[in-house]
A protein has these predicted regions:
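Exposed, low-structure sequence patches enriched in small/polar residues
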Residues: 3-7, 11-195
Length: 195
C-alpha cells in the first residue's frame, strides 16, 4: 500500500589476514513493478490486476570473502529476506480446439527466503579463468499459497570457463543449472567465442 516505508541500509566489513573479509549487509527498500521489471521477470507474462510495489523491510546477508593465493577467490554466504508483494510466476494456460495457449501469470504475496551459497573463481593471467557458483533457497509464503512457489528457485548453480585461443580472442563456455520447487531439472547451455 501507500505510505511511508522504512528500510535499513547497513554494510559492515572486517578485514583480517590481509586477504579475508567477513561482512554483514542489512538492506531493504522498495522495487517498482513496472512494465520493464515485469518483462525482465518473464517475457510471456500476463496479469489480471495492477502489480503493487514490492517492499523489502529486511534483506540480511552474512559472508566471508577471501583470496588466499594470487588468482584464487572464494565466498561463503547466507542470508534471509522478507518481501511484501514479492512477485511469483505461475504457469497458466488454456486449450481450444485449434491450439494450446500457455503463458506466465504473475501474482504477489509476502515472501520469505533463507539462502546459502558458495562461489569459487580462479584466473591465471589472461590465459584461463573459471568460476563455479551455487546457491540453495528455502522459500515460505502465506499458508495456502504454496502453489506460488512452483517456479521460485530451490537451487541455482553455474559454471563458467574462459580460455585464450589466440591473441585478443577468447572462447567462453557457460553452464547454468536451475531447480525450481516443482520443476526438478532445467538447464541452459551457452557457448560463445569473442574477439
Amino acid at each position: 500500500g501507500s505510505g511511508l516505508k522504512a528500510a535499513p541500509d547497513v554494510k559492515l566489513e572486517y578485514t583480517f589476514a590481509d586477504t579475508y573479509v567477513a561482512y554483514l549487509n542489512v538492506l531493504g527498500g522498495t522495487r517498482l513493478n513496472d512494465f520493464r521489471r515485469l518483462n525482465d521477470f518473464s517475457p510471456y507474462w500476463t496479469i489480471a490486476q495492477q502489480m503493487h510495489t514490492s517492499y523489502t523491510p529486511l534483506d540480511a546477508k552474512i559472508g566471508l570473502k577471501a583470496s588466499p593465493v594470487i588468482g584464487l577467490g572464494f565466498e561463503l554466504y547466507g542470508g534471509y529476506r522478507i518481501t511484501k508483494n514479492e512477485l511469483f510466476a505461475v504457469q497458466e494456460g488454456f486449450y481450444t480446439d485449434e491450439q494450446n495457449v500457455f503463458y506466465t501469470g504473475i501474482l504477489q504475496d509476502k515472501g520469505k527466503v533463507g539462502y546459502g551459497g558458495v562461489s569459487v573463481s580462479y584466473a591465471y593471467r589472461d590465459w584461463v579463468d573459471f568460476s563455479v557458483n551455487g546457491t540453495y533457497y528455502s522459500w515460505n509464503v502465506t499458508e495456502g499459497n504454496e502453489g506460488l512457489l512452483q517456479l521460485k528457485p530451490e537451487l541455482k548453480a553455474d559454471f563458467s570457463v574462459r580460455a585464450k585461443v589466440i591473441k585478443n580472442c577468447h572462447a567462453l563456455l557457460n553452464y547454468n543449472f536451475h531447480v525450481s520447487n516443482n520443476v526438478r531439472i532445467s538447464a541452459a547451455f551457452d557457448v560463445n567465442e569473442g574477439i
